[in-house]
């Protein structure tokens, strides 16, 4: 199980780097104008990019295990790793956010979600802990799947 979660962690962190790199590019293209300054085409592409990111996380969670319980726990676990890593990479690459109270656009689907950076970090930490606990409290058939996945 540890090897599999390590691989999933690395995947989620790598996805976060890709996402943060996109933000670096967008900020270079649209400096100090905010997200509302982007063209309708760029906005639509961003919505599709977000949807594609979620689909990639879902696909990896689906491929990682056989049972629905493990797939759901895995999706939330890698989502949390991805989300926290995204902000870590933004801080390393851009020195942003200036503080945990800095406002950000979290998602564009179905509508823009805006709030302080601390909010997704706290929620992701809670989701990470809940998913980690779920991994340790599996029914016997799921424990067997996890044990066989480690081999």
Residue ranges and their predicted role:
Residues 12, 16, 57-60, 80-87, ...:
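Helical transmembrane-bundle signal
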Residues 61-68, 129-139:
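Structural signal for the C-terminal ends of transmembrane alpha-helices
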Residues 13-28:
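Alpha-helical transmembrane segments of multi-pass membrane proteins
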Residues 37-59, 108-129:
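Membrane-interface loop-to-helix entry segments
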Residues 25-32, 88-107:
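Interfacial helix-loop-helix junctions of multi-pass membrane proteins
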Residues 1-12, 66-81, 144-149:
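Interfacial segments of alpha-helical transmembrane regions
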Residues 56-64, 89-96:
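Membrane-helix exit/interface motif
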């Amino acid at each position: 199980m540890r090897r599999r979660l390590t691989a999933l962690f690395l995947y989620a962190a790598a996805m976060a780097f890709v996402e943060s790199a996109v933000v670096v590019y967008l900020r270079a293209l649209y400096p100090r104008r905010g997200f509302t300054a982007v063209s309708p085409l760029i906005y639509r592409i961003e919505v599709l990019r977000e949807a594609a990111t979620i689909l990639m996380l879902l696909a990896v969670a689906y491929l990682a295990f056989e049972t629905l319980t493990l797939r759901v726990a895995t999706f939330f676990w890698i989502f949390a790793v991805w989300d926290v890593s995204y902000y870590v990479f933004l801080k390393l690459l851009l020195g942003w956010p200036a503080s945990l109270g800095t406002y950000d656009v979290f998602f564009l689907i179905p509508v823009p979600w805006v709030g302080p950076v601390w909010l997704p970090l706290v929620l992701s930490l809670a989701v990470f802990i809940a998913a980690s606990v779920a991994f340790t409290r599996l029914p016997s058939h799921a424990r067997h799947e996890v044990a066989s996945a480690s081999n």
